[in-house]
Amino acid sequence: MSTNSALNRLKWIRRNKDKENLTNQNAKLNFSGTMLSTLSPLPISSFKKISNHKTNKEDNKNYFHWSEGDISLGRIGETSTASRKENLTNAITYGVDRFKEDNGVEGFAIRYGLDDIDVGDVGSNLDSRTYNITYYNTSPMKNDTKYIDKIFGIGRIESDILTKLDGTNVTADRTGHQIYGTLKIKDEYKKNNLTFIPSGQIDLGHTKLDGYQEVGSGAIKVQDQHITTQNLRAALALVDDLSTDKYTFKRHGKLEYLADTDRSSSFKYNYVSDSSSTLIDNLETGALHNLNFEVGIDIIFPERFSLFAIYERNQTLDNGYSGHTDNLYLAIGYLPNKDTEYAFSLNGSENLVSNFEIKKKINDYNISFNLAENLMNLGEDSNASINVNKVF
């Protein structure tokens, strides 16, 4: 699930809501300890002025875009019920959004990821492809300081499983689907150059992994598996504005408590050679009590460029379960050419199709790129086209 990508997008907008829009090209390095985060933060730095007066309709028609590539490296040590795991993830995210008449923001983000997980020391491996589409929305509740953020997303997972058993290969394919959402309420209190931002948040998600049957000696048949996510968060963030007439400079930090209230899942299976008995393993990951710490900077230069950096640490607090995740986020932003247009739309009734289009005018030529995705069959029904027209 990737709800934090949208939340970080909205946080950037509000920290810099007195500036013009920027488009972001991001890079993320994520070095994980014994606890891997299931909600991976993705920083985005595109923003436009949000003022107290009502914006005009032409402004609300403008769409702004952001893109991001990320690399995640992680390791989970061996436990009494699971082998050691090493993880490598590569992903690309692209999003578009617009500003609403109520001074809010709404948009969509599309993410494609590749996961490579090595299990144990004998060559067992899990390769996965993930597809996610996330809708995000923020609206003021009473004034320009109190906002409610709403996130909703769907995803598809395709996995290739290789198990090394007594020197032989046991293989299987598995697919899954997920739905997730976040509701966050936050307020702002300003004193001189400091802004204090308390917030409360709830994350909900459900993933269904389809059953599968391995092929090979000692193969097992696995039933459908359901995994539920339920997090409660309370946080206090601080933004210090040190801007000058030549550039914008803001440093910010956050301290957050997270309660992971649902961490278990049942893994039900039987051996192909003996279907008379069903075995059940109760899997539990993570800790109930967690503390997240974050520090970062935003720098905006006058010539269309911006720099964005965050260091984040997620630390477990439970006795008997020790783990942490260290994340480093880096981003460089640039204001796009005014002759370039971006658009995102959803259409359909029985089949819901998303369309993303980029149009650019170069001299007398109009160049457009269109990407269409059937949301009912993520990763299976996609179309891309490039068109070039000359204006006489």
Go through the PLM ranges and name each one.
Residues M1-W12, N16, D59-F392:
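Membrane translocator/pore-forming domains, dominated by Gram-negative outer-membrane beta-barrels
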